[in-house]
Amino acid sequence: MNIAYKNATEAFEDLYGFIMGQGIYTNVGTKAVYNVGFYILNPEQRIITTEWRKFSEKYAEREFAWYMSGDRSVKNIKKYAPIWDKMHGGDNIVNSNYGWQWTRNHQLAKCIKQLKENKDTRQAWFTIFDGKEKDDYKYDTPCTLSVGFDIKPGIETLDMCVTMRSNDLVYGFCNDQYCWTKLQQLVADELGVPIGTYYHFAHDLHIYKRHFDMQEKYYKQQLKNL
């Protein structure tokens, strides 16, 4: 695998091949690689254009708008992605509305304030995973651990670093990077600096068994349609 990618599509395609070729079969129906870090040089190129992935920008925008609302209820978002209906205990309330997480204790606002007051700060971080709440994670354990910002010295661009405990490449990463880089752009605009590099670290980066032949199935269908 590479470490630096031009855009999200290049990252997705290379990582898909790397996991399928070098990943380890797990006991939970995935192939996984561990402690993977890479970066995307042009995070504003966040739309996955790989034909067989069939990325939905419309859904990604809905998910980001849901995060921005800070509403923990999945009553509406689950209409577009049924997986959300499996992540609550019957009350439609989840922990993985990241906007709810970053507004608690004004975490994101404090990051922006710190960067405005001191562009060299190393403290502009907010956390998503909260160890004090692990007993509440029965149905929905947040995949993202923390998010940090840096204004790169000399270049004066805003970098973002996202750390994740677990990351499904096909759906998780594709939508996650879309939403996180949208937030990166919003923060950069608030600070009056250009968007910089997006850094992504995943402890467990994986592909589910049902997606092992995703690429092959797509091209077989294309041949049938000729």
Give, region by region, the residue ranges found by the protein language model.
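Terminal, non-catalytic protein-protein interaction segments that mediate quaternary/complex assembly
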Residues: 1-226
